[in-house]
Amino acid sequence: MALETLGKVLLDPKATWTTKKQQQAMLEVLKREQDVMAMLKTGGGKSMLAIIPAVMMKKEGIILTLPLKSLMTDWERKLTEMKIPFQVYHPNSNGGRLRSDINLILVSADRATHAGWRQALATINQVLPVTRLVFDEAHLVLLSEDFRKSLTNISELRQLPMQLILLSGTVPPQSVMALKSAFRLTSDTIQVRQSSN
């Protein structure tokens, strides 16, 4: 079913997984039993870990948290080109409320820790259960002291019982525990790492 959805999203009925690791990560995301750290190389298909669940599970909210404005721009362009419906949370749009008819919700990491976002998320969860939160370029959180103050309280993201999915192409093995701690991931978090060889 996920592979069929991949073909529809890519407009290629013969589409296949980029790598076995992408397939493994996708299966873990779709099972939704544990948190997932997907450490796949650039071009390894990380974006599909947010897109496929949103396309397959229209009655579930999928949050995509982005730590950089440039990532927001890239994702908006990519989703528009793929004709994937999405909404972007902004406190001054739609009265700060989220729409229940569009299940893929993009939010900047700095806004995702504000009270207005927490209220909007709690409200939408009553009509569109939020089941997954995907955080792109999760390794940036480890650089937060030098990077952006707003990322220092990133563990506050999981205000609802939901699966956390961290995407990155740049997490050295020695940084995995620090990243798990920063996001307060469950001890049984699935780690899918694509070899850099």
Annotate each PLM feature.
Residues 71-94, 180-187:
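Conserved helix-turn-beta segment of the N-terminal RecA-like "Helicase ATP-binding" lobe
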Residues 32-52, 165-171:
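Walker A/P-loop
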Residues 156-157, 163, 170-197:
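Interdomain hinge/linker at the junction between the two RecA-like core domains of SF2 helicases
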Residues 81-116:
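Inter-Walker segment of RecA-like/P-loop motor cores
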